Curated annotation (Swiss-Prot):
A GO cellular component entry from the record: small ribosomal subunit
Keywords: Ribonucleoprotein, Ribosomal protein, RNA-binding, rRNA-binding
Function according to Swiss-Prot or TrEMBL: With S4 and S12 plays an important role in translational accuracy.
Domain S5 DRBM: 13-76
Domain notes: The N-terminal domain interacts with the head of the 30S subunit; the C-terminal domain interacts with the body and contacts protein S4. The interaction surface between S4 and S5 is involved in control of translational fidelity.
Pfam families: Ribosomal_S5 (PF00333), Ribosomal_S5_C (PF03719)
Family: Belongs to the universal ribosomal protein uS5 family.
Lineage, top ranks: Bacteria, Bacillati, Bacillota, Clostridia, Natranaerobiales
HAMAP family: Ribosomal_uS5_B (MF_01307_B)
Biological processes per GO annotation: translation
Name this protein carries in UniProt: Small ribosomal subunit protein uS5
Length: 168
């Protein structure tokens, strides 16, 4: 994970609840129910994070999910309204293909992936879920893919050449 050079409390973050699940723990006296919430937060300007919260009440689970998501914020490198290059994000059984798109294309993505991309502020992108359709795996795979993105300047710096030489 990249080193954080920003303060999550100074960003104007909005949150989106992706999934709420009722989970059960079986104990000697019967079943104990609680709720699990998968939440994505972002400032719609390049910062995004996802988190899980679990509690007996739904609002408390969502609050915990938001706190967890703020701890896991990443900065997404963007070129205009899309991403710099194609990438496949992987997490567990989840695989998500992310492709840059021309301006005006919109966000072509399903459910959990769309939530992450919209919170990140990406307006034009093509995606395809290749693996598991579990919401948590898809969200984490999307964030893993976004975290691996590099701009042309970063690639040139890593290779020790200029951006002009890199682009031909």
């Amino acid at each position: 994970m990249r080193r954080k050079d920003f303060d999550p409390n100074k960003l104007d973050l909005s949150e989106k609840v992706v999934e709420i699940n009722r989970v059960t723990k079986v104990v000697k006296g019967g079943r104990r129910f609680s709720f699990s919430a998968l939440v994505v937060v972002g400032d719609e300007n390049g910062y995004v994070g996802a988190g899980n919260g679990k509690a007996v009440e739904v609002p408390e689970a969502i609050r915990k999910g938001i706190e967890d998501a703020k701890k896991n914020l990443i900065k997404v490198p963007m070129v205009g309204t899309t991403i710099p290059h194609e990438i496949v994000g992987r997490d567990g059984g989840g695989q998500v293909l992310l492709k840059p798109a021309y301006e005006g294309t919109g966000v072509i993505a399903g459910g959990p992936v769309r939530a992450v991309l919209e919170q990140a502020g990406i307006r034009d992108i093509l995606t395809k879920s290749l693996g598991s359709n579990n919401a948590k795996s898809m969200v984490n795979a999307t964030i893993a893919g976004l975290n691996q993105l590099k701009t042309a300047e970063q690639v040139a710096r890593l290779r020790g050449i200029s951006v002009k030489d890199l682009q031909g």
